[in-house]
Structure formats: structure tokens, C-alpha cells
């Protein structure tokens, strides 16, 4: 049986620790971390966008300045850190693709914006199928919405980029990061811009 190139590549990874990446998709920021040698490298983008006038001149200026933007129909949207700069300059508010920790159901432009923001921080996978864990909030106690839609959309964005996405509760992620000496038993608290997440764990469960 002939093995494919991808199968041979993955076979070479067996017995090694697959480092992968971690992505925190928050209401305020989208952040990514991965390891290069002994160093952990972080990339961050503000989770926001701002609509500007769509003209050829504006597009040329943004291209020359390497500003991230999306053109949709007749509209041009600046995303990330630069969106806040534009909003401050025009004394207006930015718009956010997330609300209460999940993709906003009332923001019609949320999906293309969060997709571009995720792409800008995770980049290309080191190999096809590289694992990336992404944070998700728990089910809310004071609202009636399901996080499943949010999870499936983010999974789809990451799969399109060539990753193998795996969701992880953000409170649980803190426990796995900080409580190894306590056998991953304790309480993890995550204070975000849209929600506060609490996770109680006993021996990592």
C-alpha cells in the first residue's frame, strides 16, 4: 500500500511532542501563542472593525500601509488594531464581531471579520493538520444562547487554513496551564471583556 506524502510526514512526527498552537478568541482581543525553540511567541489583534469610505484612493493608502481590511459589496472595513486608530480619529466607536464571548448574533458582518482576525494571528500551519486549541466560553447562566454555533464556525475557519482545531473551555485551559503541581485540581477563573468563566476541575476532569 502506497503512503501519501502527508502520511509520511505525520509518521515522522510520531514519538515527538507536537507543539501546535493555542488561540484565545476573546471579546476584546484575539491572541495566538506557539513555541519557537525555547521561546513562546505571541501574536495579538484587537477584536474590532471599523467602516471607512470605499474609494480607490483609500484602498491604495491602506495597501501601502499594510492595513488589514475587508471589502464586502460597496463597503470597506478596517479590522484589528488599526480599526481603533481610525475610530479614534473620527471620534466614533468600533464594531465588534463578538458579544458576550461568542460570535455576535446581531452583527451581520461578524463572520468575515472574525475569520480575518483569526487568520492574521494564527498564520499558516507548520504542517498540514497541525493541532490548534482555541478557547471557548462555558454555557451562560444569565442568558439563553448556545456556544455550539460559535464553536462550529471557528472550527470551520481553522480547518480552511489547514489546521486540526480542538475547542477547550477557557477556565479549564487555565487549570491545565497552572495547576500541574495540584494534579490539575482546583478552580480556574477567566475574566474576559464579555464574560467571566469559572471551571471546577478534579484531576483534570
What are the residue ranges of the model-derived segments?
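Coil-to-beta-strand transition motifs
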Residues: 193-195
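Nucleotide/phosphate-binding catalytic cleft detector across ATP-hydrolyzing
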Residues: 1-191, 203-205
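Short, acidic (Asp/Glu-rich) active-site segment that either coordinates a divalent metal cofactor
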Residues: 197-200
Amino acid at each position: 500500500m502506497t503512503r501519501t506524502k502527508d502520511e509520511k510526514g505525520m509518521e515522522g512526527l510520531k514519538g515527538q511532542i507536537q507543539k501546535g498552537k493555542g488561540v484565545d478568541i476573546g471579546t476584546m482581543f484575539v491572541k495566538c501563542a506557539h513555541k519557537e525553540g525555547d521561546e513562546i511567541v505571541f501574536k495579538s489583534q484587537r477584536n474590532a472593525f471599523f467602516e471607512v469610505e470605499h474609494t480607490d484612493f483609500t484602498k491604495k493608502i491602506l495597501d501601502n500601509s499594510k492595513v488589514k481590511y475587508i471589502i464586502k459589496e460597496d463597503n470597506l472595513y478596517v479590522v484589528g488594531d488599526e480599526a481603533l486608530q481610525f475610530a479614534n480619529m473620527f471620534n466614533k466607536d468600533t464594531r465588534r464581531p463578538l458579544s458576550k464571548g461568542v460570535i455576535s448574533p446581531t452583527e451581520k458582518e461578524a463572520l468575515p471579520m472574525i475569520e480575518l482576525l483569526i487568520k492574521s494571528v494564527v498564520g499558516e500551519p507548520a504542517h498540514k493538520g497541525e493541532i490548534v486549541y482555541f478557547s471557548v466560553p462555558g454555557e451562560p447562566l444569565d442568558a439563553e444562547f448556545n456556544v455550539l454555533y460559535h464553536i462550529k464556525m471557528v472550527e470551520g475557519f481553522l480547518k480552511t487554513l489547514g489546521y486540526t482545531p480542538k475547542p477547550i473551555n477557557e477556565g479549564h485551559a487555565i487549570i491545565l496551564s497552572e495547576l500541574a503541581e495540584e494534579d490539575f485540581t482546583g478552580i480556574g477563573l477567566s475574566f474576559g471583556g464579555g464574560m467571566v468563566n469559572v471551571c471546577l476541575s478534579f484531576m483534570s476532569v
